[in-house]
Every structure is written in C-alpha cells, then in structure tokens.
C-alpha cells in the first residue's frame, strides 16, 4: 500500500481515538509520508520510534500488533507456556503505562497470564522478574536513552536476556503476518485483574531483586571499610533508577549518597536535560553542580530505563572526569 492509502485507512477507522485522529488531521504531506510509508520495524532488540499516529510510529495499534505476534508464538508452544506467561515493565516515558497494560490486554484475550509492574521499574528488574517468576518472556516499554518524543517495545526471552534467534525470528514472522492491527481484540484490563489473568506486581519483586543485588557484591568487606566515607551523587535523569538505586546503594553500605532531586522526579519530557543519555557529559550538569557543593568523589547517572550507566570521578584539581564506557568496563574487569 502507498503511504496515502495507509493514511486513509487510519483516517477512515471509526474507532480511532480522538487524540490520534486530531494528529492525523493536522499532518502536512511530508509528515504523512514519514508516518505511513513503512511499518515500524521489529528487530532482535524490539522496536522504537517516534510516538504518534501511523504505521511508522509507536502507538497502541503498533503495540497491539507486536503483542499479538508474541501471543501467537506462545499459543503455538502450548498451554504450559500460556500459564507461565509474560512479565511486563515500563519506564517514565509518554504512554509507557498505557502501552504496558495494552500489551497485557492483548495477551489476556488469548488466555495468557501476565505480570505487570504497578509503576515504573528498571529494565534489569524486568529481566530478573522473568527468571524469578519463570515466565516465557518479558516486555519492556522503553526507548532507552532516546529523546522524549520516542518510545519503544523490547521483548526478552525466558532467561531474561535477548530472545534466542529461533524464537525472535518466529516472533518477527508472526508480527509481519498481521495485516490489520485494527482487528486485534483486547480484553478488559480491570476484569482480567479481577480474574487473576493480569496480575499487578511490585514490592515483593523489588525485595527479592534487591536481595540478589546485595548478594552479588564482590567485596563487601571493602565497602564496609570505605563505603561510609565515599561521597556519591546519583541522578536517575527523570527515569526508573529512582525506584531502587538509593535503596541498593544504602543496603550495600554507601551511607553518603546525595540524589539530584530535580532529576529524581519521573518526567517524560526529561525537562532538565537535552538528552537523557548518561554517557554524555552534558547530562551530568546538575550532578556536577551538586557534586561540587557536597564534595562528591563519584557521580553516577542512569538512563530512563536504568540499564545504561555513566560515571564521573573527582580529579585533583576539583573537576570531574567523564569516564567512557570502555574505561568503566576496564575498571570493572580489573576490580
């Protein structure tokens, strides 16, 4: 289909939500072409794109299509896999909670169990939940460190990591085979919460995850000796890291942790940074300001879904050195 035909198909869909219809009606020709000339591609790491109306955007219909593909893959594997189900988490971006529960609603229509976090959680905790709960897969609604207009949809395998190639290829084939995402049926979320097919999770998984985080400390004796004196400034850059990072650091024995409070608020617009990328020194501006104020030894930042970390260390001249990912990796390997 041409982009004009795709656009008309969307515009003619009677049940299209008002906010999407309004967006369609305000599109110029160039935007129409970009939004409808292709489908948002689902790859091995999932998909991400601009939020909005269109086949080349991320929205409830594109999310439904991806989840419908996953549901068909699970159905093919049988009832045991439907009972094991899918763990679902989401970050602080626009529409992240809606996309998460939209995914659960599609799965529920197929009789597939889902476990959805009650509020935003980091990607590493989603991976943990997949293994802890024994689910077949995990869905993470996030666009990682992309700018605010983006969101995304990642699928994880039963080990909490990237799906193995045979499952990933099958999932992609199922998604591509769906010709009309408007025809995908969804269950009533509140009704399925009551039935137990959609289970909301939170504190109990947090506690188990934090316990495992504590248990993987390599040298607790070293932390006990020096951790209380090390001054750390942490910023979650308006993302999910705020949910657990303070608690993880405190339970490990780091007693002097200051958080950049202006960036501890979940903000889908990431208002205090140009881009929420912790590998960019520009994202550390407020952390450096607080660091100089409190005399911090180390500055730490995480991206919106808290699976990417940036670090700066205090220099003798009082400035902060921004470490590259390679430098951080080398330091960790040596340690």
Locations of the language-model features?
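N-terminal small/polar loop signature for handling phosphorylated ligands or for N-terminal nucleophile
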Residues: 87-150, 255-310
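Alpha-helix capping and helix-loop boundary segments enriched in small/acidic/polar residues
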Residues: 57-58, 90-98, 114-121, 158-166, ...
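A glycine- and small-aliphatic-rich helix-loop capping segment at beta-alpha/alpha-beta transitions
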Residues: 102-110, 133, 154-162, 247-255, ...
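An N-terminal, well-structured beta->alpha segment
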Residues: 3-103, 192-229, 240
């Amino acid at each position: 289909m041409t982009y004009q035909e795709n656009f008309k198909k969307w515009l003619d869909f009677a049940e299209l939500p008002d906010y999407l219809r309004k967006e369609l009606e305000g599109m110029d020709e160039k935007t129409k072409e970009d939004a409808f000339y292709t489908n948002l591609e689902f790859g091995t790491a999932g998909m991400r794109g601009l939020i909005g109306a269109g086949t080349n955007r991320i929205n409830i219909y594109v999310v439904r299509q991806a989840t419908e593909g996953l549901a068909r893959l699970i159905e093919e594997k049988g009832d045991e896999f439907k009972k094991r189900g899918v763990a679902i988490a989401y970050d602080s971006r626009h529409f992240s909670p809606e996309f998460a529960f939209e995914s659960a609603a599609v799965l529920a229509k197929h009789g597939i169990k889902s476990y959805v976090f009650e509020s935003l959680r980091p990607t590493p905790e989603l991976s943990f939940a997949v293994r802890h709960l024994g689910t077949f897969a995990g869905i993470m609604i996030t666009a990682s460190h992309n700018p605010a207009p983006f969101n995304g949809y990642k699928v994880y395998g039963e080990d909490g990591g990237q799906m193995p190639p045979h499952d990933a290829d099958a999932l992609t084939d199922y998604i591509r085979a769906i010709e009309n995402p408007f025809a995908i049926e969804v269950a009533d979320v509140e009704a399925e919460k009551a039935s137990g097919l959609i289970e909301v999770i939170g504190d109990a998984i947090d506690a188990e995850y934090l316990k495992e985080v504590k248990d993987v400390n390599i040298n607790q004796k070293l932390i006990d000796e020096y951790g209380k004196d090390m001054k750390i400034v942490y910023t979650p850059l308006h993302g999910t890291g705020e949910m657990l990072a303070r608690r993880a650091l405190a339970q490990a024995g780091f007693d002097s942790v200051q958080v950049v409070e202006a960036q501890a608020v979940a903000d889908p617009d990431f208002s205090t940074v140009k881009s929420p990328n912790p590998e960019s020194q520009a994202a550390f501006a407020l952390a450096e300001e607080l660091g100089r104020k409190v005399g911090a030894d180390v500055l730490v930042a995480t991206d919106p879904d808290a699976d990417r970390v940036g670090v700066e260390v205090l220099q003798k001249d009082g400035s902060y050195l921004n470490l590259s990912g390679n430098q951080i990796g080398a330091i960790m390997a040596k340690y």
